[in-house]
Design a protein with these regions (language model features):
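Sec-dependent N-terminal signal peptides
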Residues: 8-17
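Surface-exposed alpha-helical segments enriched in charged/polar residues
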Residues: 19, 78, 82-85, 89, ...
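Bacterial Sec-dependent signal peptides at the C-terminal "C-region" and cleavage site
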Residues: 16-25
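Non-catalytic architectural context of zinc metalloproteases
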Residues: 24-72, 104-105, 172-185, 201-203, ...
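Positively charged n-region of N-terminal signal peptides that target proteins for export
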Residues: 1-9
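Active-site-flanking segments in enzyme catalytic domains
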Residues: 99-248
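Auxiliary, metal-adjacent structural segments of Zn-dependent hydrolase domains
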Residues: 57-120
Length: 248
């Protein structure tokens, strides 16, 4: 009995050591504390990381997020995985996407946000509590920011802005704009949502996200909207330069 108990104890100690080692490896790679591996995708190799405790990172701790409620995470993960499996491993690698950090109530400089991309660490932080109405689209919106930041030369914002009517002007920054609504316009006039009108990169990300979720509806709208049609063609051409096999 003694030997049996000792073997069990050694196994438990080993598992604890392995878990701690994994946590240290994750921190060394992406510099976010209190994470654990939630799942490694067999489809495209994404490492999904769960937050065991609240964390604070960035300049002066300006990025904060809370630990995940496990029941909430279990429910949201079904949606998250379904959407991210639309991207193959080769495409993700080309766009510096490897780690998805899952947490609740994500803030940057006291502003709530759905996601924070970091191509240097190949990491995307996702707020699993983001508004359910827009949640799936937000996932692709944030993926686009990873894509654009990885290939800025293919997403010329001056060229993009030239598609708009001459009198239109974007805001100076997304956070200094009151153009925040995410609902799809009935009459697009070059923009799918009010948020699209904030800055060029958000405009691109909004179109990309809608194409990933509801391509047919957006293409139908573009048939009556030349500006939107040009923007869609621009995104498709840019993506083809990154990965010719990519399809919406």
């Amino acid at each position: 009995v003694y030997n049996y108990l000792m073997r069990i104890l050694l196994i438990l100690i080993s598992l604890t050591f392995i878990t701690a080692t994994k946590a240290d490896e994750i921190y060394n790679l992406i510099k976010i504390p209190n994470l654990e591996v939630y799942k490694i995708s067999n489809e495209n190799g994404i490492r999904y990381l769960n937050t065991k405790k609240d964390f604070k990172i960035g300049l002066d701790g300006n990025v904060t997020c809370n630990k995940s409620n496990l029941d909430n995470l279990k429910n949201k993960f079904i949606i998250i995985e379904k959407n991210f499996e639309k991207y193959n491993s080769n495409f993700l690698k080309k766009n510096n996407i490897k780690y998805i950090v899952l947490c609740e109530s994500l803030y940057i400089s006291d502003i709530n946000t759905g996601g924070i991309p970091d191509i240097e660490k190949r990491t995307l932080i996702i707020d699993i509590n983001f508004n359910q109405k827009y949640f799936e689209r937000m996932l692709h919106h944030e993926i686009f920011h990873m894509i654009q930041n990885s290939h800025l030369k293919y997403f010329d914002e001056n060229k993009w802005s030239s598609f708009n009517k001459k009198e239109f002007e974007y805001a100076e920054c997304s956070t200094c704009s009151d153009r925040l609504n995410l609902d799809l316009y009935n009459n697009t006039d070059g923009f799918l949502t009010e948020y699209s009108k904030s800055i060029p990169s958000e405009d691109m990300a909004e179109i990309f996200s809608f194409l990933m979720i509801n391509k047919i509806e957006i293409e139908n709208k573009s048939k009556k909207d030349k500006i939107l049609e040009n923007k869609i063609k621009f995104i498709e051409l840019s993506l083809s330069k990154i990965d010719k096999s990519f399809k919406f």
